[in-house]
A protein has these predicted regions:
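Bacterial Sec-dependent N-terminal signal peptides
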Residues: 1-22
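Surface-exposed charged/polar residues within alpha-helices that form helix-capping/stabilizing sites
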Residues: 54-55
Length: 208
C-alpha cells in the first residue's frame, strides 16, 4: 500500500502547486491578483519609486509629474538598468484633448564621433563598454519637455524625493545587488565609475 499512498501524495502536491498559481485563470503564470484604484496608480520596478509616484499624485501632481519623480528615483536605485544619462521614450494620452502624444528623447551620437573616426581607428563595430557606445543623454531633456506640456508641480518638488534618497540612502534590493555585483569586474576597469558605484571596489552591504 505504501506505493499507492506515495502516488496520492504526489498528486495532492501537484494539485496544490497548480491551485496556488492560479488567479481565476487556467494559466500557471498568472500569479498576481489585479490591482484596482479609484483615483490613479503607479507601477515601477522598485517599491520606493512606486510610492514616490503615488505621493506625487496625492499632492495633486499629474501622471507626468509622478512619472518623472519615479524615473528620477529609478535612476538612483537601479543603476544597472536605468539612469539620467540614458534615453527616454514616452507615450502620453491626454484625456482632455483625446489625443495621443509620443516623445522620442533618445540621445544622438556625439557630433565628432563620425563614421570616418571609426574607420581611421580600425573599429568595425561599436564596443559594448567604454565611452564610445555612450550617446548624448536625452532623459533629462525629455523630463522637461514632458513637464512643459503636461506637468503641474514645480520640478524642484518633483525631484526632491530622489534628492532625499540620494543624500540619506536607500535599501538595496537583492535583484539589483545581484546585477550590480556581476558588473563590478567591468566597471573596475574605469576608476571614476568604480569610485561612484562601489565602496573601495566592492558592492555595498545588503541590510535587511
Amino acid at each position: 500500500m505504501k506505493p499507492i499512498y506515495f502516488f496520492i501524495i504526489l498528486l495532492l502536491l501537484q494539485f496544490t502547486k497548480t491551485m496556488s498559481q492560479n488567479r481565476l485563470t487556467s494559466n500557471p503564470f498568472a500569479t498576481r491578483s489585479e490591482v484596482i484604484a479609484q483615483n490613479g496608480m503607479a507601477a515601477t520596478s522598485h517599491p520606493l519609486a512606486t510610492q514616490v509616484a503615488i505621493d506625487i499624485l496625492k499632492k495633486g501632481g499629474t501622471a507626468i509629474d509622478a512619472a518623472i519623480a519615479a524615473n528620477a528615483c529609478l535612476g538612483l536605485m537601479e543603476p544597472t538598468g536605468c539612469g539620467m544619462g540614458g534615453d527616454l521614450f514616452a507615450i502620453v494620452w491626454d484625456a482632455k484633448t483625446q489625443k495621443l502624444h509620443g516623445l522620442n528623447a533618445s540621445g544622438r551620437s556625439p557630433k565628432s564621433l563620425t563614421l570616418d573616426y571609426f574607420k581611421e581607428k580600425g573599429i568595425e563595430k561599436i564596443p559594448a563598454l567604454g565611452p564610445l557606445p555612450v550617446s548624448v543623454p536625452g532623459c533629462v531633456d525629455g523630463w522637461f519637455e514632458l513637464h512643459g506640456k503636461f506637468g503641474k508641480m514645480p520640478m524642484k518638488e518633483i525631484l526632491q524625493p530622489a534628492i532625499d534618497y540620494a543624500r540619506n540612502g536607500f535599501p538595496l534590493t537583492e535583484l539589483i545587488a545581484y546585477y550590480w555585483e556581476r558588473n563590478i569586474p567591468y566597471i573596475s576597469q574605469y576608476p571614476n565609475i568604480t569610485e561612484t558605484f562601489t565602496i573601495e571596489g566592492k558592492l555595498p552591504n545588503l541590510i535587511f
